[in-house]
Amino acid sequence: MKVAVVLLVSLLAVTYALPEKRIFFGGIVDKVKDTFTKIFNKAKETFDKITDGFDVDFDEVVDKLIAQIHSTPTKAACKAACKKGAKLILKAAAPLASQVCGPACNAALAKLEKIADDINDDDD
């Protein structure tokens, strides 16, 4: 979950950056992508090693998990994280955490699911 939040924050920063700052952030995005690729490949290697001899396809499992990004359990986890980190995340609006974390998490998870789908589509 922490990796997903860091990835989402990085992507949002690049999206809203001024044009002259996008070059700098572009380097950060490249590093995030490289890190993601390394994590993904290591996870695949570990998964394949553990499931050797079983009829389980890593990519199918990943696709099924992507569909779960924007689900009830992840919404609950996001809201809990938002409320716990309200001062950092919401700043002056921290007292409104119980009211705004739900909609914010709904949007963040929808965006994260779209990003995951887009990355997954690029790999096909």
Swiss-Prot record:
Domain notes: The cysteine framework is XIV (C-C-C-C).
Signal sequence range: 1-17
Disulfide bond keyword on record: yes
Stretches assigned to coiled coil: none
Keyword Manganese: no
Protein name (Swiss-Prot/TrEMBL): Conotoxin Cl14.12
Lineage: Eukaryota, Metazoa, Spiralia, Lophotrochozoa, Mollusca
Organism listed in the record: Californiconus californicus
Transmembrane segments: none
Post-translational modification: Contains 2 disulfide bond.
Chief location: secreted
UniProt superkingdom: Eukaryota
Cellular location(s): Secreted
Propeptide: 18-74
Tissue expression: Expressed by the venom duct.
Entry keyword set: Disulfide bond, Neurotoxin, Secreted, Signal, Toxin
A molecular function (GO) term: toxin activity
One GO cellular component, as annotated: extracellular region
